[in-house]
Amino acid sequence: MQNFIFISPNFPTNYWQFCRELKNNGLNVLGIGDQPYEELKPELKASLNEYYKVNSLENYDEVYRAVAFFISKYGRIDWLESNNEYWLERDAMLRTDFHITSGFQVSDMPRIKFKSKMKEYYQKVGIATARYHMVDNFDGCKAFISEVGYPVIVKPDNGVGASHTYKLSSDDDLRHFLIVKELEVSYIMEEFIHAEVNSYDAIINSKGEPIFETGNVSPISIMDIVNNDDNSVYYIVKDLHDDVRKAGRATVKSFGVRSRFVHFEFFRLTEDQPSMGKKGDVVALEVNMRPCGGFSPDMMNFANSTDVYKIWADMIAYDSTLMPQGEHAFCAFAGRRDGKHFVYSHEQLMQKYQGNMRMVDRIPDALSGAMGNQMYVATFPTCLLYTSPSPRDR
């Protein structure tokens, strides 16, 4: 029996389903988290063979001791994963320290966590990347801006989501950023790309081959949602575009991905941009070596009439899957921000789209910055072109 340690199986709240499918496939599923056992969902408790509670997952020594305890009790650990961006480096440290070879090691982290390091691997397979400059001082940044022009995007070179991301449109913006930026954080400055975000989401086997593929489109960037306190909108595509599939598969090979659920983000240019390409071209944004966040795995299920939790667990247990896919549809997510005025009330939305709704819930505070406060997930056979609402209706 294979031993699988799942870090933070209780959060995100839908991740217990990964554990359920691992256990259904005969693995010994061992959880490590900082939530008291008695507060875990009954479904999660039933999906774990054992749970080790630590005071804080931020405390490496505590988590290290938890892994050591499981090894002393169950023997060699075959897998250790969180499927969570926040813990990717922690996962790699634990694998390296305990010689768990089924996933990324500490030495792999730079190319998959640092945005500046990713560019080399995109370029190896002919995928265009934005020009960039590592933030130093005003004069250095201005020299770069003189080449690419305003606006520019500035974000942590190693960052999660859109936190501490800035759009600078003037010298005054640049001066302000240089004053307020965190001194201990390394920032990357990139030329602004006129585009929408298209993703490649896939479950990859040990040979670097996809056993499941889909993708999403984000008409509003996460940066704008977070910085403008806006509503969140994105959707899972009914069928993955061939150019996104091609770029995604090339990226898998270039980055040496094995045995993972991945979420790769690309820009699709909305206008010609001489430094990047023609309108409609797919160019690089960043790689994320984990599933798309929030309720996206459930949305993938709705869009493809399948179960990605099981497909992922099948990849772990068998390196393949027999899980079928049924009828495809578009699956849309709308996250509404509390305190804003909307044309339709909650009750009116539920009445109008009752036949389409798949999930309706409040969003946990930890995710609300990028996703809004009230979420709706619905499926549709067709997709109308999204247009940004007026400020009144946002």
Roles of regions detected by a PLM:
Residues 1-105, 139:
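ATP-binding N-terminal substructure of ATP-dependent carboxylate-amine bond-forming enzymes
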Residues 88-97, 107-123:
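Well-ordered mid-protein domain cores that form the structural environment of catalytic cofactors
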Residues 111-194, 205-209, 234-246, 250:
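Active-site nucleotide/adenylate-binding loops and adjacent lid/helix of ATP-dependent enzymes
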Residues 169, 336-338, 377-383:
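Short beta-strand-to-loop capping motifs
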Residues 191-257, 261, 268, 272, ...:
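ATP-dependent carboxylate/phosphate-activation module, predominantly the ATP-grasp catalytic core
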Residues 314-353:
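A glycine-rich beta-turn/hairpin centered on an aromatic-Pro dipeptide
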Residues 354-385:
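Polybasic (Lys/Arg-rich)
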Residues 386-393:
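Conserved small/polar residues in nucleotide/adenosyl-binding loops
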